[in-house]
Amino acid sequence: MGKIIGIDLGTTNSCVAVLDGDTPRVLENAEGERTTASVIAYTDGETLVGQPAKRQAVTNPQNTLFAIKRLIGRRFEDEEVQRDIEIMPFKIVKADNGDAWVEAKGQKMAAPQVSAEVLKKMKKTAEDFLGEEVTGAVVTVPAYFNDAQRQATKDAGRIAGLDVKRIINEPTAAALAYGLDKKGGDRTIAVYDLGGGTFDISIIEIDNVDGEQTFEVLATNGDTHLGGEDFDNRLINYLVSEFEKEQGINLKNDPLAMQRVKEAAEKAKIELSSAQQTDVNLPYVTADATGPKHMNVKVTRAKLESLVEDLVIRSLEPLKVALADSDLSVDEITDVILVGGQTRMPMVQAKVAEFFGKEARRDVNPDEAVAMGAAVQGGVLAGDVKDVLLLDVTPLSFGIETMGGVMTKLIEKNTTIPTKADQTFSTAEDNQSAVTIHVLQGERKQATYNKSLGQFNLEGIQPAPRGMPQIEVTFDLDADGILNVSAKDKSTGKEQKITIQASGGLTDEEIEAMVQEAEANKDADKKFEELVTARNQADQMIHGTQKQIEEAGDALPADEKEKIEAAIKALEEVKSGNDKEAIDAKTQELMQAAQKLMEIAQQKAQAQQGADAGEQPKQDDDVVDAEFEEVKDK
């Protein structure tokens, strides 16, 4: 089996790691960075990912997509999506199936399709390092992701050409990375994971028994729409309102200006983690009839903290729930680990330390721990890592809608996965010949307040008084946290099974079409890369030849010079085109024509060497080395 890589597919940044011997190793991308910005830009004929996409965002805001993880597996009507529509510079649109999709360059795309571009870059980074094709991956998701979001993440992997061997929760992955080299006694750790768009808290017990480490998740909780992007947005709104007070102009109507403000806010937020004050200075941010306008706003750490304090406090509520669910008190937590870039904010660190009554550990890299843990799990699945057992849990309860619009739970939240549960139900009316099984995920008793995962019918039930037929419903939850449901009529043996495909979500046909499109683009991207390489070689050849013509001077016969210049002109005519073969052919012709230049250059070099040898002075045998001391006039 080939290497199974570990990928942290983040809202703001993504990271890829691989097991190097026994140690997880974070890999650098083509730009030499250990994390890749989860930003995708669509330009004329090219798709940019990471830093190249981020760099051009100011001039191309409508076609530069970021924080797509906030949309993955979500419906357009979701309250969180509606909030994002107001603040995102790109278009969020409603798909035919009701999902939240995005639009760029006039093309509508599903969130998994866009996220697949980031996964493709992670895959390529690993392949460049390993020198072989990579197909297997462990991809992490927020612990509090529901079934639809997990399924959509797997779909993104498939579109990127990856076989997602396992979906694991981000805090659990971080605990794996942290605990792997801690071979001491048992410990109970709290992983507080505040990333770019999501927040999780997991309470995990690490046991060491006879050399085997067991990582058991006791409880998990969180908020899939709370993260660094929300902190950025608070600061963006403050900067925009300050500018409006001063200049009377609302920048929210200007996408280019808003993109600049977004970048400046993100930078200021990061600076305020180490400085007490920073200046947000944006010259020529916009203009009106009176001329150009500049933004210059001083932001103190105290001001930023006042803007986001409620967000930090909001993150503490899930901590209380997770502790209660695991039947533990704060005193029983051995270590606190902070994961996610937003945990670098001093206020976050202080509030978490205050809650747990202890400082968080400093020996965990908040940006890399999750990918490293995913690589460890990849090693476990590939058989390269022995003596490590991971027991994760489902973050939310699963059940079905029963009479009166009630949700009846079959699998409770924080149940260790994989797991299976069944329960027998009956009909609500006399002579009922079919039942609809409506599958739900959530914690509310009222069915409508929970997430609908889908529904299916069991037909052909024999007529009988209500309450008589015996219908056995079985829930089978796999290690990825994805649900399979079956319903069986015990009297007839008729059975209906489904893998939960939410009322939204991508169908297999849609995913396959996207895989084919990605493959086609892969070939197109390769051809484009080859074309650019050919153009660059042509440029170098022209520049080098022109330089040699100058150096050759009169030594180059006029007819040869004419021949070479004609070859240069022919190459210049084709090098801007899209015909790689023509560029290669004309480059070759120029090389042939420039043979005379090579001969002249060699002759000159040989003549120079001969001259240098003749000019060397004869050593006088009577000369004696002496040391001189400089005498200065007094």
Swiss-Prot record:
Residue numbers carrying Phosphothreonine: 198
CDD domains according to UniProt: ASKHA_NBD_HSP70_DnaK-like
GO molecular function, one term: unfolded protein binding
Keyword flag Nucleotide-binding: yes
Comp. bias (Low complexity): 601-613
InterPro entries from the UniProt entry: ATPase_NBD, Chaperone_DnaK, Heat_shock_70_CS, HSP70_C_sf, HSP70_peptide-bd_sf, Hsp_70_fam
Pfam families the record matches: HSP70
Segments for region (Disordered): 601-634
Induction, per UniProt: By stress conditions e.g. heat shock.
Keywords on record: ATP-binding, Chaperone, Nucleotide-binding, Phosphoprotein, Stress response
Disulfide pairings: none
Family indicated by similarity: Belongs to the heat shock protein 70 family.
Function field: Acts as a chaperone.
Protein name: Chaperone protein DnaK
Organism of this sequence: Aliivibrio fischeri (strain MJ11)
